[in-house]
Amino acid sequence: MKNPRKVGLWSLTVLLILGIIGGGFAWQRQQHQQKQPRIVATTFAVVQIANKLNLPLVGVPTTANTLPQRYQHVAKVGSPMNPSVEKITALKPTAVYSVTTLSDQFGKAFKAQHVTPHFLNLTSVAHLEQTLTQLGKQYHRQSAAAKQVKHIQAAKKLAKKRAQQRPAPRVLVLMGLPGANYMVATNRSYVGDLVRLAGGTNVFTSRKQEYMQPNDEAIQKTNPQVILRLEHAMPKMVTKQFDQEFKDNQMWSKTAAVRHHRVYDLQEPIFDATANMRVTTALDQVSHWLYPTKGVKV
């Protein structure tokens, strides 16, 4: 017959071991949860990047764009132009991402809540590549980031090949503003960068400015051969504004672009004011507009 004391000791030992093992698993699970990033993306461009890098998000912007399946039930934090600091802080994020072009939108309310967003520079294709590489390294997604950069570089090579030994067309880029007419996009803007990569010559250049006020006399003097009209916000309204402007202002009818029917409308989801993961399709489209196969004067 077994000694009751020994049986009790064995039982106690087993319970202690199981407790230690269970506690160890619980500790590991807690540590894993603490290491998991809690990322809030406040623009659709950042959501696209996160999706390509297979990153988890706890907050996404309120947008008319179709979110990737994995983020469709994630908490909405408001529009990119006016995100809710209350909703963001409630999510206890480890990182909040926006873009440099919207840095002015994050003011005193965010500072008061000690929320410091990271502003990603997506003003050019090169900056998008750098952002992918940096985020890939930070979140251990180097392979996924390298894959996306490779796709972008392939698209750049294809556009360059298409433009070889062909005269560069003069291109005017306009950005429509709902209810406020339009601005001229320079070579420093994202679409301006697409024009450069596609082999075109932007008729308005700047060292620092992405956008500038339009001037009829200056536009007429440059006589653009191609006009690209960006309508990324409220496209239906902006397209009507552009159509009315081009109808009422006789200056446009004198440009080579209008005479030869080379005015193109750029809309989401392919085109936006900032670089995004539709860049390869966008660059290919601009390349074909600038260098059509045949039948169009350049």
Where in this protein do the model-derived segments appear?
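Sec-dependent N-terminal signal peptides of Gram-positive bacterial secreted proteins and lipoproteins
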Residues: N3-Q30
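Alpha-helical, coiled-coil/dimerization segments enriched in small aliphatic residues
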Residues: T63-T66, R70, M183-Y211
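Structured C-terminal subdomain patch of bacterial secreted/periplasmic proteins
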Residues: P37-R38, E129-K137, A146, K150, ...
